Swiss-Prot record:
It comes from the Eukaryota. This is F-box only protein 8. It holds the Pfam family F-box. Gene3D superfamilies: 1.20.1280.50. The gene is FBX8. Residues 35-80 form the F-box domain. CDD domains: F-box_AtFBW1-like.
């Protein structure tokens, strides 16, 4: 009697298990494969998907979770997003400034165009008024100065970073001076740096010329440090070129002598080469005081 009852109980339990198994199989068979959602998406696949989305959509996904916010803000993802070949043509920005009234400026951004030989610009009302005299663009960042402070603006995230001023300069604490900033990138270590030149001359002939070179590494807790104290005194030009981790710009040591300065962003080493000229030529020089015309 006891054995028969035990056997019946075991058989009943087996039937329940088989019934549950068949029910799960039926539900899977009825499920539409088009609406099936995977429980887990590998991170590398997730990154590949996100890098092919428009920038505005990527910024919205930062609100999904802390993990997504950290992922989309990571340096790896930002670099990956820049090199994906399927991304649309990047926007071009233009700033128009009234030379007689620096408080009047107009920011334009490129609009979609059907012709590869022309550009169409519209007024961009999404970017805040930035000001400044010179705008520099590097890897999607807009760099400018206002009130003698260096500022970096990300047009994709609408984030603005204001860097501290140089407080230990011997020139800034004295008479009127010229100050000019350059933004550059180290592709080996993937680091951004600012090079600042502070210069002073008593007249247009660059008499009593003095200059200083300062570097700021864009990282948490970064600060200005003075470098190359033995570098020749000079007045830099606002024309510069970033190429393969090296910053190039022109500088004047006197009204008739111009040199090409190269700055290795990674090693922070400077090199110079005199610009060739014919006898008697006077090289053009930037207008005195133009670099500190900021507001």
């Amino acid at each position: 009697m006891g054995f028969s009852f035990l056997l019946a109980t075991v058989q009943k339990e087996r039937m329940k298990r088989r019934s549950r198994t068949r029910s799960r199989s039926r539900r899977r068979a009825k499920q539409d494969p088009k609406t099936w959602v995977a429980r887990y998406i590998p991170q590398d696949l997730l990154i590949e998907i996100l890098t092919r989305l428009p920038p505005k959509s990527v910024m919205r996904f930062k609100c999904v979770s802390k993990f997504w916010s950290s992922l989309l803000s990571s340096r790896y993802f930002c670099n990956r997003f820049l090199i994906v070949p399927s991304q649309p043509q990047p926007s071009l920005y233009m700033c128009l400034l009234d030379r007689y009234n620096y408080s009047k400026s107009l920011i334009l951004s490129s609009a979609p165009s059907t012709s590869p030989y022309s550009f169409v610009f519209d007024q961009d009302l999404t970017i805040r008024k930035m000001g400044g005299f010179f705008l520099r663009i590097l890897r999607g960042f807009i760099f400018f100065t206002r009130n003698l402070k260096a500022r970096i603006y990300n047009p994709t995230t609408r984030q603005l970073v204001i860097l501290p001023t140089i407080k230990e300069s011997d020139i800034i604490a004295g008479p009127p001076y010229n100050i000019l900033y350059f933004i550059c990138h180290d592709p080996v270590n993937d680091r951004y740096k600012l090079l600042c030149t502070v210069s002073y001359a008593s007249d247009n002939d660059l008499q009593n010329l003095k200059s200083e070179l300062w570097i700021f590494v864009l990282e948490a807790g970064g600060s200005w440090k003075r470098v190359a104290n033995e570098f020749p005194h000079h007045v830099p030009s606002h024309l510069d070129l970033n190429m393969n981790g090296v910053l190039y710009f022109l500088a004047w040591t006197d009204p008739h002598t111009c040199m090409l300065v190269s700055f290795d962003v990674r090693s922070e080493e400077f090199n110079t080469m005199q610009v060739p000229r014919n006898a008697g030529d006077t090289l053009p020089r930037q207008e005195k005081g133009v670099v500190n015309r900021v507001w």
